[in-house]
């Protein structure tokens, strides 16, 4: 159920999107109060259930309905359930749901106010639309890995930004529908989202402007301390931060250099900074550099963040009681009037809410019993 006192209270989202971007979108919407119903396949559910850490991180707070869309009665039940929604979100290959009778044009006939959001790799049209890909390929094609020494990134940026823009599409559509009474069709391509967030790199190139030098300052980098702890300096271009750093590191000859002059001498200055920082432990630099108001910080581990007082004060980690014991999650990042809206329930078991929600949607008891039977007859299994 939705949370009436939260920003998205009263909005129901039915999701047919699996794995990463769709579930990340509905996680954000759910934390902000939307009632999220996840449609899963009865055998195995969302494939990400095979990866417990991933599934738990993305799927708390939702209700699970297991339906085999190849079964005519299950397909009809799915359409009925979608009829109770404000937003439907899907992540199938382009055209698949249309062939099943669950495309935007078909569902809009039932409910003209329905907001329909499709998230896919390359969008619903274009020469790449049917290309299979995961996050690394999206980043490569979008130019994000165009560096002297390309490396596999640690974060799935296409999945993350795809999810965020999918949530943005859902909220945009719901807001528009409330004012106009009509929904709409929102086509989110993960590839497009990466081009959008790479605008500061791509727009200068498109307009034959000089490339920016942000990140080339010798005061922008990672440095090892005497005790092996790594720390970061992020002086992007500011001369006053550089002057403060030179005072803290006893580098008077470099104190008055401009950003352009520093970049010209980047290698030598970077080496000088590294040499000085390596001479003292991290605790020393916490006091000296952070104390001087220089953009500085340690490289935190997951354990560091779990114990961080700032993170605790902002209530970013929230623990809730579940049938499987207490579980800890990271909330969506917005504080709304000082309230840290977060998860209201844990991760659902596969099909846990099928009977409840189909019955509430008015589906005949005999049909509900038949659709639930495969779940009740199977061997009980853990969430994942």
Label each residue range with its predicted role.
Residues 1-182, 205-206, 320, 349, ...:
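N-terminal helix-loop segment corresponding to the beta1-alpha1 unit
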Residues 43, 121-123, 190-195, 227-229, ...:
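Glycine-rich beta-alpha junction loops
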Residues 151-161, 185, 214-220, 231-232, ...:
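A short glycine-threonine-serine/GTX helix/turn-capping micro-motif
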Residues 173-210:
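Substrate-binding/catalytic subdomain of NAD(P)-dependent oxidoreductase enzymes
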Residues 209-215, 221-222, 324-327, 346-349:
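Short Gly/Pro-enriched turn/cap motifs at secondary-structure boundaries
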Residues 219-292, 296:
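Aromatic-enriched alpha-helical interface/lid elements that frame and gate functional surfaces
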Residues 256-270, 300-307, 324, 366-384:
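Short linear loop/turn motifs
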Residues 291-344:
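A glycine-rich dinucleotide-binding beta-alpha-beta segment and adjacent secondary-structure elements
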């Amino acid at each position: 159920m939705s949370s009436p006192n939260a920003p998205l209270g009263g909005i129901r989202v039915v999701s047919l999107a699996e794995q990463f971007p769709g579930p990340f979108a509905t996680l954000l919407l759910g934390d902000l109060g939307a009632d999220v119903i996840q449609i899963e396949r009865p055998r195995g559910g969302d494939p990400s259930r095979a990866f417990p850490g991933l599934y738990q991180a993305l799927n708390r707070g939702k209700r699970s309905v297991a339906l085999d869309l190849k079964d005519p009665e299950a397909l009809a039940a799915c359409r009925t359930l979608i009829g109770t929604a404000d937003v439907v979100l899907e992540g199938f290959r382009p055209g698949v749901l249309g062939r099943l009778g669950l495309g935007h044009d078909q569902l809009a006939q039932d409910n003209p106010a329905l907001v329909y959001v499709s998230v896919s790799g390359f969008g619903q049209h274009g020469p790449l639309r049917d290309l299979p890909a995961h996050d690394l390929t999206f980043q490569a094609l979008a130019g994000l890995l165009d560096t002297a020494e390309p490396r596999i990134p640690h974060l799935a940026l296409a999945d993350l930004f795809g999810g965020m823009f999918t949530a943005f599409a859902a909220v945009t559509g719901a807001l528009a529908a409330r004012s106009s009474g009509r929904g709409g069709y929102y086509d989110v391509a993960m590839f497009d989202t990466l081009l959008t967030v790479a605008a500061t790199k791509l727009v200068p190139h498109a307009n034959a402007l000089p490339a920016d030098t942000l990140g080339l300052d010798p005061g922008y980098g990672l440095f090892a301390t005497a005790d092996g702890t790594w720390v970061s300096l992020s002086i992007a271009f500011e001369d006053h931060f550089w002057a403060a750093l030179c005072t803290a590191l006893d580098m008077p000859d470099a104190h008055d250099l401009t950003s352009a002059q520093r970049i010209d001498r980047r290698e030598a200055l970077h080496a000088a900074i590294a040499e000085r920082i390596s001479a003292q432990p991290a605790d020393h630099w916490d006091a000296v550099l952070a104390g001087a108001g220089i953009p500085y910080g340690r490289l935190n581990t997951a354990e560091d963040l779990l114990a961080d007082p700032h993170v605790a004060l902002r209530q970013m980690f929230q623990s809730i009681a579940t049938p499987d014991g207490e579980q800890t999650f990271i909330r969506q990042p917005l504080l709304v009037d000082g309230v840290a809206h977060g998860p209201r329930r844990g991760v659902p078991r596969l099909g846990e809410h099928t009977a409840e929600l189909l019955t509430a949607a008015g589906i005949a008891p005999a049909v509900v019993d038949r659709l639930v039977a495969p779940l009740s007859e199977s061997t009980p299994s853990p969430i994942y």
